[in-house]
Amino acid sequence: MAKLSEKQAELFRGKNWGTVVTLREDGSPHATPVWIDTDGENVLFNTAIGRAKERHLRRDPRVAVTVLPADDQQSGYVSVSGTAEITEEGANDHIDKLAKKYIGQDKYPYLQPGERRVVVTVKPDKVDSMGS
């Protein structure tokens, strides 16, 4: 398993958007902007059951996540390729934490009735970067 450096982890901890790439059933890539986080070892993002990312990852857990610094996109990037693990445990708390980080709200305001959130944990197999 590859490891994030502290500088790379800080980029995921910051108020920077990530791009998640999953694989469609036909093998073509599907890229989506997401709110991101890290536990220092893995990359984390949140989605809802039934969304394309979640369906793709249940079928094929290979995933890539790239982050650029929001304040200086010329300074580099970090891209993590790895394997996704999906859990509902703690997902609502996680999306609330991300809402606080990205939009300054204590509760995620876009939760739909009946929506079930999941945390996706990306275990890095490879870390590529430039400037980080």
Give residue spans per PLM region.
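Extreme N-terminal tail/first-helix region
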Residues: 1-17
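Charged, gly/pro-rich active-site loop segments
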Residues: 2-3, 74-132
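Short alpha-helical scaffold segments that flank and stabilize functional sites
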Residues: 11, 25, 85-87
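Short beta-strand segments
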Residues: 16-49, 57, 65-67, 76-79
